[in-house]
From Swiss-Prot:
Keyword entries, A-Z: Cell outer membrane, Glycosidase, Hydrolase, Lipoprotein, Membrane, Palmitate, Signal
Transmembrane segment boundaries: none
GO cellular component, one term: cell outer membrane
Lipidation (N-palmitoyl cysteine): C20
Chief localization: membrane
Family per similarity comment: Belongs to the glycosyl hydrolase 43 family.
Originating species: Formosa agariphila (strain DSM 15362 / KCTC 12365 / LMG 23005 / KMM 3901 / M-2Alg 35-1)
Stored Gene3D superfamilies: 2.60.120.200, Glycosyl hydrolase domain, family 43
GO BP annotation list: carbohydrate metabolic process
Protein name per its UniProtKB record: Beta-xylosidase
Pfam families documented for this protein: GH43_C2, Glyco_hydro_43
InterPro entries recorded: ConA-like_dom_sf, GH43_C2, Glyco_hydro_43, Glyco_hydro_beta-prop_sf, Glycosyl_Hydrlase_43
Length: 592
């Protein structure tokens, strides 16, 4: 993220804000004229000129935002999902819609392919989105492979194949770039952790280095210079405002070292800090904490995001809530905070306890009035020859084994033989996945298609299936998965008989009634992190099947609603999906 010369023309002088030492004047909230046509709920746009955080209450983590003209563009990480690095756009910072992905596939390594599925938790991590001299840039670090960049003339693509810039041996994560128009130099800051740490640096934590880049943003020109070390310090963003350099970083404050960062512990907090220098991008820097978790989101820390400005020159900050909570099952959502400036420092949110540090707001006036309530699309009737941007595959799909055109108006998922339960296939079993069912067949079954759940209160999704194309040893149906999976579907035995079945996270099956009709409707509902399945043959009368189960965050992924099809013995059989609908307690566009 950077504020280039074109964007700088739209920015108010921060000095005028500093002189006030107060919040920008609050205008009267104006409701959208189209609110009656759309749905609101317990989060996001409320239709009355206000919003409730999180404004994007779903698994859209590690955001970065770039503004071009009157439009804001966001990228978020999505690990091993393909296509990777979702792109969203907004006119008002509150209502966001999906418009594409940076990476059509995770093409740079074999572990992300359908015949390996060995890239769980890796793939696309926190990226940086930039627009410079007519070109879009997306930088990201794959923990297993290193720093890369993709480019495009159009935010909606096509994007180039990634160009590798630095190896994994030198970098860890979270790059951010800046083009300095004053000196005609380009820079990138990277969390190198301890990979280049020298004995002379006795400060505990991650090292963050600034490298000089070529002006075209594709080459590293030097060895980098250390600018900051801190406990878990990462997710840097660079800004130059009125000649002063600011580096925003997320950093852990550990009041209790008995638990790891990221584990629920009220004594620990991943805070937002800011470095400030009036001399050079390399410092020296002053340091200040500008946002802490506060009380409105229980124990969830609030940090890591991007600074923005509205047409009225007010400043705003988008950040995520991290996973240090009992039930962060929806993943890491996005929150929008007002920003005020005091003595040249930003305060993010509202300083509730007057200690000079902001805390997140729960509800606030929208930064920009007049736009309709909307949200990322969820429903699908599969009438388009292309998949909607809400959908992503578990690893790169086997493209010969799915279709939207073989039966127009339906999604066809052909079954492949499940991959072997051997090293190099499926999740790596380690301290984070021990005894969670990661060796179950589901994790090695390719072409599972899914989308994020929305919100944490209630939700109900329904899909209609045609099971007439299924073959012996095939399993297909509906799955909820993130850290664990639970699925309900149809299994065909060796004699060709179809039965309903439920499978729990360790792979144990409960077999249900025989299915002798072609049409099957599966419905799943959740209240908080407790979910159930139901089935129907007519779409009206549903019966419960299987237990109440717990949905969970894991593999750096929140709970997802998905469609699966695999075969235990061979590549054989298919299932057709007519439509998918999803209702939840949150904003939804009128045209869904």
């Amino acid at each position: 993220m950077y504020l280039n010369a074109c964007r700088a023309l739209t920015l108010i002088s921060v000095l005028s804000l500093l002189a006030c030492n107060s919040e920008p004047e609050k205008k009267q909230a104006t409701p959208s004229k189209e609110i009656a046509k759309a749905q609101t709920g317990s989060w996001g746009d409320q239709g009355d000129g206000t919003y409730i955080n999180p404004i994007l209450n779903a698994d859209y983590p590690d955001s970065d935002i770039e503004q071009v003209g009157d439009t804001y563009y966001m990228i978020t990480s999505k690990q091993h999902m393909s296509p990777g690095m979702p792109i969203l756009e907004s006119k008002d910072m509150v209502n966001w819609t999906n418009v594409g992905h940076v990476f059509n596939s995770l093409s740079w390594a074999p572990e992300y392919n359908w015949d390996r599925m060995n890239g769980y938790s890796f793939g696309t991590w926190a990226g940086d989105l930039a627009y410079h001299e007519g070109t879009w840039y997306c930088y990201q670090i794959d923990y297993q492979h290193g720093l890369m960049v993709a480019t495009s003339k159009d935010i909606k693509g096509p994007w180039s194949k990634p160009i590798m810039m630095l190896p994994k041996s030198e970098v860890l994560d979270d790059p951010a770039v800046f083009w300095d128009e004053d000196t005609h130099k380009a820079y990138i800051i990277i969390n190198t952790a301890g990979k280049q740490k020298e004995a002379s640096n006795t400060i505990e934590g991650n090292e963050n280095r600034i490298y000089e880049m070529s002006w075209d943003g594709t080459k590293i020109l030097d060895e980098g210079k250390l600018v900051y070390t801190g406990m878990g310090a990462e997710a840097a963003k660079i800004y130059k405002i009125d000649g002063t350099w600011y580096i925003f970083l997320a950093q852990w404050t550990m009041g209790d070292m008995s638990t790891k960062p990221g584990v629920k512990n009220p004594k620990n907090d991943r805070k937002q800090i800011v470095l400030r220098s009036k001399e050079s991008i390399y410092g020296p820097y002053e340091v200040k904490t500008v946002l802490e978790k506060g009380t409105v989101f229980n124990n969830r820390s609030a940090s890591q995001g991007a600074l923005m400005q509205a047409p009225d020159n007010s400043w705003w900050y988008m950040h995520q809530l991290i996973q240090n909570d009992d039930i962060p099952f929806q993943g890491r959502p996005q929150c929008l905070e007002p920003v005020t400036w005091v003595d040249g420092w930003p305060i993010i949110g509202v300083d509730e306890d007057n200690d000079g540090i902001g805390e997140p707001v729960k509800t606030y006036k929208k930064p920009i009035d007049g736009y309709p309530v909307t949200a990322p699309r969820t429903d699908d009737d599969f009438s388009s020859p292309k998949l909607g941007f809400q959908w992503e595959w578990n690893h790169n799909p086997r493209n010969t084994h799915w279709s939207l055109t073989e039966r127009p108006g339906w999604l066809r998922l052909k079954a492949s033989k499940v991959l072997p339960n051997e090293k190099g296939y499926g999740p790596n079993i380690n301290e984070w996945t021990n005894n969670d069912g990661s060796d179950s067949d589901f994790w090695r079954a390719n072409n599972t298609l899914s989308q994020r759940i929305m919100g944490i209160t209630t939700g109900t999704a329904v899909a209609k299936f045609d099971v007439s194309g299924m073959k012996p040893h095939q399993l297909a149906g509906f799955v909820r998965y993130g850290g664990v999976f639970n699925l309900l579907g149809v299994e065909v035995d060796e004699h060709g008989k179809k039965h309903l079945f439920y499978m729990e996270p360790m792979g144990e099956k409960t077999v249900g009634p025989e299915i002798t009709v072609n049409d099957l409707y599966i419905r799943t509902s959740n209240r908080s992190n407790q979910a159930i399945y139901e089935y129907s043959f007519d779409g009206k009368n549903f019966k419960r099947f299987g237990p109440t189960f717990t949905i969970a965050f894991g593999k750096w992924t929140g709970d997802r609603l998905g469609l699966f099809s695999w075969n235990d013995k061979e590549d054989a059989g298919y299932i057709d999906v007519d439509w998918f609908t999803y209702d939840y307690d949150g904003p939804k566009a009128a045209n869904q």
